[in-house]
Amino acid sequence: MSEGNDQDAGKGRLSLRPAGRMELGRTVDAGSVRQSFSHGRSKVVQVEVRKKRGLQPGTPSAPEGGSSSAPAPQSGNAPQGTPRSGGGNRGSGRGGAGGAGRALTAQELAIRQRVLEQQRVEAARREVERREQEKISILSAAEEARRREEEAKRAAEEEARRKEQEEADRIAAEAARKAAESAPPAEAPPVPPPAQRERTAAPSSRSAPSRTAPSDDIRRPSRPAPIPSKVPVAAPSAPQTLRLRERGDEGEEERKPRRAGGGGAPAPRKAAAPVAKKAVAEPRRGGRIDVRAAIEGEDERTRSIASMRRQRDRERRQAELERLRADQLKVVRDVVLPETIAVGELANRMAVRAADVIKQLMRMGMMATVTQTIDADTAELVVQEFGHRVRRVSESDVEVGLEGISDIDSDLQPRPPVVTVMGHVDHGKTSLLDALRATDVAAGEAGGITQHIGAYQVTLPSRQKLTFLDTPGHEAFTAMRSRGASVTDIVVLVVAADDGVMPQTIEAIKHAKAANAPIIVAINKCDKPGANPGRVRQELLHHEIVVEDMGGDTQDVEVSALKRQNLDKLEEAILLQAEVLDLKANPDRAAEGTVVESRLDRGRGPVATVLVQKGTLRQGDIVVAGAEWGRVRAMLDDKGQQMKEALPSTPVEILGLAGVPSAGEPFVAVENESRAREISEFRQRKIREKMAAGIAAGRGTLEQMLSRIQAGAQKEVAVVIKADVQGSAEAIATTVQKQEHEEVKVRTLLSSVGQISESDVQLAKASNAVLIAFNVRATNQARELAQREGVDIRYYSIIYEVADDIEALVRGKIAPKQREKFLGYAEIRKVFEITKVGKVAGCMVTEGVVKRGCGVRLLRDNVVIHTGELSQLKRFKDDVKEVARNYECGLSFAGYNDIKEGDVVECYETELVPA
């Protein structure tokens, strides 16, 4: 063996002999294993195992000098507080000897007390610090325990993953070993010289070995030697690596085959198939350090599988930490909440899942679905729970900024006054306006009364303009008078000199005071023989109207519309009052005003009479009037002439609206159609909701309806109202509602303007309603349908006729009432007991008559003790129909026998009378 080693050394081959050329160092342990060959042969070979260096991170390696010793304390630095040997003892001795028999002075005592107090304060401070330190220690210990628990949990998970990986590696290694055993044994070829080996290293390692060498020394097993499962770790004190190089080729990069012993045969190689499988199927095992890698010269420090696992675990934990941080950094949003919102829409606005919103609602005790609608308060609580900001909005926000900004004084210009003429019916309001306008409107009015609100503009000889609103005086037109007073600047109160103050005059005074409008009293009909203007002034005092003649500040003018007397004085009074008010408006802005009246014209469609109060209305403007909108296609004045623009205080008729707006609604010009459509849709939706709520409230609960039907009290009169203008339809609806009775309900199914159509007839037929047509007619198709279906269409032109007919209808629905009629009294003089009949009272009729079958009340001491009917009425033994006063008779009561002498019988009968 030694000769072989020397020979190998001389040839420049590897050797395991511990000579000066090859050193294993302190990181390699040597051992021997027995290799088994074919035909029962075996041989002992030497094996070197490279040990893994087990350095802990952060631990410095020991110095090469060997053992390390702690630095000795310096002798020159003495501890603080240690008395010096020498003078200290001497001084102490002197102090002790000098102060043994002397008392402390006051200064020394104060110093000592101060020192003791400082010591107590210091002790208290240290105690507080100790307690705080204990609290911190407890919290730190809890945090450390939690951290250790988490680390233990992670370590357990890593250990489980490691075991699974090791089991997979073991199964793969076992499969590779079985594949290597099943392969035929391979023989190594002879080792070529170094120069030739450098050229043919790669091809020869893959070629099949020759089988012509019969010597046992050169035969090697086909499988490598077993590797110990646990490789001992080298001590960290000697950082050395195993480098196996040829004697003369230390710088050569090519790896040389290993020599097992003294023979010159090359080291055995593994079969090609297992090597390829290992390189392809398990690439992660390429960095593992084994015996073969150490022998072949793979001396670089590569990363182990455990290190790679730790790196992957660190990366996974880092990614998990970043994900958790991303979840914690939530985006706070401004969530806009309307009055009602669906659950799904709320989730979308918060950018969360709808399921999370539903869970939160369930925690709040509310079961909801994705499509269910919740109110704004509940939605606000949910948004706050998710950590977002809430911004509440209302559907009415679409009207914000609709009226524009306030005008500045420099933009204001004088405007004509708006004068409303009010008063009682038939006091001459329209005639007075006709006299001022030089027209004859009153002659064409039905019934001689005004039933529409009219708007006119008069130009005086002085070129000044006055705008007049003529309001109806009938009691049914309260809403019209209220609208006129709300948009007016001056109220002209017309009172007939021969009639005085009447109910509608009082109502007009209240409307004017509510609108805070000044009043000018026009005492009309002063040309009539019975005129008494003084009485009118006296009656006005009862309503706090004090004219100037009586020391007040209210102007009064005695006029005659028929004779056109003092009309100029009335105009002067109006102009004077307007000058006092100093009326101004800004014409250079979007138009605003009020709808005075509206109607549905057959040829022109919806027509609205509006009064411009601010700005200038031009043809082509987009306006919103109440719940309707449209573009102004045409404008007409009170004389029917076309206009291009309307300045403030100008009444005009506008065409082009989508529908008939309600009278009294404001109108405003907007910038575009989308804004107008949005506002109109919002207002129409509000009207529908209000109507639905009113219907539901009027209907009541199902139990209430059933109880009314069973009691026979569910009676109603249904009406469908069609009028020429919106104000008349409104007045008729109000008049109809006033005719209600406690037993009969009057219900207005429809109140609109325009002709009667087939749909109106069908509605009246379905609900058994009366169709009221006020100043309108039915179409031919509607008339024929009404005749076939038997629908009653009633035409009217005067409003009080409508009120009379509806009152008659309601009275016809009321059931007749029972009225009690007194007959007489009878006094019981004697009581008889008769078999099979019971007690019979012998009576004397003291007042009136007693009739058979009448109702009776039995009075005892003026207290009613029984109410019933007479069963028998006899005189002596004969049955009679009635007994007159001062005659005796016998009475018996149906089902009652508790009668005594001295009781009084009151007799009466009931009769039906119409309600």
Swiss-Prot record:
GTP binds at residues 423-430, 470-474, 524-527. Its main location: cytoplasm. Residues 121-135, 143-180, 243-256, 279-295 have a biased composition (Basic and acidic residues). Pfam families: EF-G_D2, GTP_EFTU, GTP_EFTU_D2, IF-2, IF2_assoc, IF2_N. Residues 186-195 have a biased composition (Pro residues). It is found in: Cytoplasm. Residues 1-105, 121-295 are annotated as: Disordered. One of its GO terms (cellular component) is cytosol. Keywords: Cytoplasm, GTP-binding, Initiation factor, Nucleotide-binding, Protein biosynthesis. Residues 57-81, 201-213, 230-239, 266-278 have a biased composition (Low complexity). It comes from the Bacteria. Residues 423-430 are annotated as: G1. Residues 524-527 are annotated as: G4. Residues 448-452 are annotated as: G2. Residues 470-473 are annotated as: G3. Residues 84-101 have a biased composition (Gly residues). Residues 560-562 are annotated as: G5. GO terms for molecular function: GTP binding; GTPase activity; guanosine tetraphosphate binding; translation initiation factor activity. Residues 414-584 form the tr-type G domain. One of the essential components for the initiation of protein synthesis. Protects formylmethionyl-tRNA from spontaneous hydrolysis and promotes its binding to the 30S ribosomal subunits. Also involved in the hydrolysis of GTP during the formation of the 70S ribosomal complex. HAMAP family: IF_2_B (MF_00100_B). PANTHER family: TR-TYPE G DOMAIN-CONTAINING PROTEIN (PTHR43381:SF5), TRANSLATION INITIATION FACTOR IF-2-RELATED (PTHR43381). Belongs to the TRAFAC class translation factor GTPase superfamily. Classic translation factor GTPase family. IF-2 subfamily. This is Translation initiation factor IF-2. It comes from Granulibacter bethesdensis (strain ATCC BAA-1260 / CGDNIH1). The gene is infB.
